Amino acid sequence: MTQVTVKQLADEVKTPVERLLQQMREAGLPHTAADEGVSDSEKQSLLTHLKSSHKAKVEEPRKITLQRKTTSTLRVAGSKSISVEVRKKKVFVQRSPEEIEAERKRELEERRAVENAARQKAEEEAKRRAEEEARRQPAAAQPAGTEAVAAPVAPVEAVREAAPVAAAPAPAADARKRDEPRRPDKPRADDNNRRGGGGDGERKNAPHRASVKEKAPAPRVAPRTTDEESDGFRRGGRGKAKLKKRNAHGFQSPTGPVVRDVQIGETITVGDLANQMSVKAAEIIKFMFKLGTPATINQVLDQETAQLVAEELGHKVTLVSDTALEDSLAESLKFEGETFSRAPVVTVMGHVDHGKTSLLDYIRRAKVAAGEAGGITQHIGAYHVETERGMVTFLDTPGHAAFTAMRARGAKATDIVILVVAADDGVMPQTIEAVQHAKAAGVPLVVAVNKIDKPGADLDRIRSELSVHGVTSEEWGGDTPFVSVSAKVGTGVDELLEAVLLQAEVLELKATPSAPGRGVVVESRLDKGRGPVATVLVQDGTLRQGDMVLVGSNYGRVRAMLDENGKPIKEAGPSIPVEILGLDGTPDAGDEMSVLSDEKKAREVALFRQGKFREVKLARAHAGKLENIFENMGQAEKKTLNIVLKSDVRGSLEALNGALNGLGNDEVQVRVVGGGVGGITESDANLALASNAVLFGFNVRADAGARKIVEQEGLDMRYYNVIYDIIEDVKKALTGMLGSDVRENILGVAEVRDVFRSPKFGAIAGCMVIEGTVYRNRPIRVLREDIVIFEGELESLRRFKDDASEVRAGMECGIGVKSYNDVKAGDKIEVYEKVQVARSL
């Protein structure tokens, strides 16, 4: 055995000799000098001591890591292969005895806590049941032996009679002993069995379980499941005290239908509706199919349809409006400042040709009516006039029946309505409609009886006719001023303005000029050189050039402003009508105009309104199609006149759309496949070509590209400047599409007096013509007692053996009916003809 000295060992491990000797003494070795020898066994003893002093682990490693790698080949298209390497890694950790003991103690404490809680609950339950049983049964005492076998609660009653307070815990303890399974006496041995440490605990507990089984259990108060079992613990089991917890992460199936609160906006898709109801979209689609409405998962439903589906499926519906963005916009537009009086906005309304524009002409000292096509107003005109009594803003509305929507907008944007009634015509349909619009808008009326210089003017008749519709003059005790005027000579115009301004004073009209501008669109059009142009009536605040404005679903910066005379201006205050340039599209007449601080907010609101309008429109259109799908089934297909309509202003386009869509019947209809504001372009001509439509231009013309396509393809393109003409032409076209009806005209009636036989013609009826004229080779009917028994053709007509082409009334003749020989005396032969008659709408 090779030995080294202490000094050599110190040099080898690079440590001082004195320190090495000290460590050897601590290890229990006898070395004291540097020249003493050290054997291998002494080295091992020293090494073991040093490891234990540094708390190193002398046992086997506690953590084992296993790595596994598999390689496979995956073939793809093109005869290529890809190598796939899968690596798996598993780590096994051996716990120390201290950790195992700590976990065992923790589990034991948890189990004891659960047992104590369950024991306490069982005692309370047994006590409660014993008290209930005591109240139900009579208080008479019975023999103790019988009580123990027959009823488990009787001993409690007997003891309670002797000492009611002291004996109370006894029945609870008995009930607990009867109800609970027996717990093992040695939890440590049971714990070893649970960890699989050996079979000693199993063998020790076996006699104990046998003794438990041998004992006859006392009758239970009521069968029940203990809290220990429901929490996953079992008493007296096969050595394993703890089971897996049941329903720890399981899904509890609902015992009844789940009613959810479904929030539905103006539109919602089938998928979103299914998510809110926590059902599959297929169930909603299936349900809608049962209702007769085919749908898809991305189908947009309108609010009414979605509400019907959700309520039918048993859910609670809350209708919401997606107006958070609009509400924030309205909040940002609030402005407080000093208010001043503003000029009244006056709308002139009345029947067509009653002199509305002529009256305004006299007030403005202008000649607008002469420039109107056909002498009728077809746009809303906005003007402000400086009078001796103050400024007044006038809105001139059309009186034709097609412009109902325009008149309704004029009434909404106004403060006072001047109702013009012609003294010679009286109250007409559009007069009544104007009264209804004014009442709906809550606007006061001033009646101007025009054309009083004409003969036949009857003011009392007009007062009487208007009083029927709720407009009573001040002379008759009402509150509506009646002023007699003549727009031609100017009679009564000053009195009319005075009445208007008096009404304005009563209304106390106020505005805040320092606020951001706010108003309403009166009219809009597309100018080829300047782009979209909107006529705006400023209602509050001040609109300035360069402001960022939001108009309906359009927005833009005001590049220029023009007054009603076309002169550029920098700003416009309350009650001033202006034309603004710079919007990204032509807004609808009646849209509200607001000045915003930044472009981002304007764009956000405009895009939101566009998307909302599109969704609502699609949902309603789809709902309408589905509602009519079964009604139209089996009916003959309607003939359709397709029209591409272009107009100079948005209001006229809307009026024409309404008028044209109202034409037609069950067989023919008008469909406006395209339309817009501005001239007829090449795209409009291509649309008309693709949809087989007629091009109509109302106060607009076609550009060179559109004219070229029209000439090459032979399209029908027409220009109009009066709304009467376009409606009449469309009516004629629809009438031509209706075709013609076949009508029967009775030419004559002959009565059979006698019947003769002819070898050539068979039975010949000798007749007297009693009505009209009988013609040869015309269709006839044979009537017997006024009932048609045969329809055929008149083959032979003779008079005194001579052939005749016709026989008039009061004359006798012989008639041979083709292919019919059953003619009898007293029959009537009716001769008629078929005539084609053109149909009309």
Swiss-Prot record:
Gene3D superfamilies: P-loop containing nucleotide triphosphate hydrolases, Putative DNA-binding domain, N-terminal subdomain of bacterial translation initiation factor IF2, Translation factors, Translation initiation factor IF- 2, domain 3. Residues 341-510 form the tr-type G domain. Its main location: cytoplasm. GO terms for molecular function: GTP binding; GTPase activity; translation initiation factor activity. GO terms for cellular component: cytosol. Residues 396-399 are annotated as: G3. Residues 137-173 have a biased composition (Low complexity). Residues 94-258 are annotated as: Disordered. It comes from the Bacteria. It is found in: Cytoplasm. GTP binds at residues 350-357, 396-400, 450-453. Residues 375-379 are annotated as: G2. CDD domains: IF2_eIF5B (cd01887), IF2_mtIF2_II (cd03702), mtIF2_IVc (cd03692). Residues 486-488 are annotated as: G5. Residues 350-357 are annotated as: G1. Residues 450-453 are annotated as: G4. Belongs to the TRAFAC class translation factor GTPase superfamily. Classic translation factor GTPase family. IF-2 subfamily. One of the essential components for the initiation of protein synthesis. Protects formylmethionyl-tRNA from spontaneous hydrolysis and promotes its binding to the 30S ribosomal subunits. Also involved in the hydrolysis of GTP during the formation of the 70S ribosomal complex. This is Translation initiation factor IF-2.
